[in-house]
Amino acid sequence: MLTERQLLILQTIIDDFIGSAQPVGSRTLAKKDEITFSSATIRNEMADLEELGFIEKTHSSSGRVPSEKGYRFYVDHLLAPQNLPNDEIVQIKDLFAERIFEAEKIAQQSAQILSELTNYTAIVLGPKLSTNKLKNVQIVPLDRQTAVAIIVTDTGHVQSKTITVPESVDLSDLEKMVNILNEKLSGVPMSELHNKIFKEIVTVLRGYVHNYDSAIKILDGTFQVPLSEKIYFGGKANMLSQPEFHDIQKVRSLLTMIDNEAEFYDILRHKQVGIQVKIGRENSSTAMEDCSLISATYSIGEEQVGTIAILGPTRMQYSRVISLLQLFTRQITDGLKK
């Protein structure tokens, strides 16, 4: 069990190192207003913290840096919530106030903004639709040649896309088709829609719409939606701006992993509910042993539908990132309900 003095010194070392990326020595600590102990006391406590495995020496400096054990203790026991600047809160809320109907756009823009706000790499795993059930479908004409097809699921997820309307299909045919779809398909799992449409619905449509072949083309375009999760990245190259990763050889395997994307898909799709923090070698990939990955799940109602994560150095601004993720997951959840 650490003493109050050791807790204060450990927290100050980690806070300072996160901000400066420079090893922290006793002289640096002695200049801090919150540290009122003598230099000798500070050195003794630092020696004890090193012996306990919370901090460690570097080859190029007499100062100390946090170890993985130190970061883990910091995250679990010392971290305090950080209040985000009001302008950032407004920026994030304004994004979701735009009523973005497409889950894909919500995920893409979330990844981009998070990467800009943190200068780390942001990763968003979009919602998986295959287990959702169709609630209703709408086809809203924009002009004579185009319309917006809107699919709403039982979880409140909204998927929209622009489709082409052949000249041979009139508005009355569109209306009949939508009525038939909603009558026959409401409550059907999304993964079964394609099979049900082309085995059952097409036969029904033949007796109601004038231009059957063109109506089938509209159907095919309307229900071509991705059922598996899609992964979106923001700031893939942001790691290169971190002092820890200026050595390109050191970061090569990480950049390859980020560029490949598939491994992150496997990592994120099995995340537990809530905020999860993986530090250094706690991560499953050796390419991430100098990184921390903070992830949070977002949901619609009781159902977890996606994951949003930030990848950065172990010297990460943990409190700020966690606060951002908490705000984003709330906003994404609300955005997908619109």
UniProtKB/Swiss-Prot annotation:
Keywords: Repressor, Stress response, Transcription, Transcription regulation. GO terms for biological process: negative regulation of DNA-templated transcription. It comes from the Bacteria. Pfam families: HrcA. InterPro entries: GAF-like_dom_sf (IPR029016), HrcA (IPR002571), HrcA_C (IPR021153), WH-like_DNA-bd_sf (IPR036388), WH_DNA-bd_sf (IPR036390), WHTH_transcript_rep_HrcA_IDD (IPR023120). Negative regulator of class I heat shock genes (grpE-dnaK-dnaJ and groELS operons). Prevents heat-shock induction of these operons. PANTHER family: HEAT-INDUCIBLE TRANSCRIPTION REPRESSOR HRCA. This is Heat-inducible transcription repressor HrcA. The gene is hrcA.
